Amino acid sequence: MDIKRFIANFADLFEETDPATISAATKFKELEEWSSLVALSVIAMVDEEYDVEFRGDDIRGSSTVEDLYNIVNNRVMAYS
C-alpha cells in the first residue's frame, strides 16, 4: 500500500480543497471542508479501495492523514 495513492484517494473526497494542499502531515479535521459527511466518505473509500473495516472511532482517534493511512495499512497487512 502506497501513502501517495492513499493521499490522492483522500484528496479526491473534497470538492473545493486543492489536492496539492493535502499531505501526510495535514491535520484533516482542520480542513475547511471537513464534515461528518466527508468522514463517512472516508470510511466508504477505505472499504471500497482497500477492502478493510474502518470506523468512526478510527477517524476520531486520528489527527493527520498519515494517522489514517497507518491504521488502514496495518489492517491491509494483517489481512494479507
Identify what each model region corresponds to.
Residues 1-43, 48-80:
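Phosphopantetheine-dependent thiolation modules in NRPS/PKS and related acyl-activating systems
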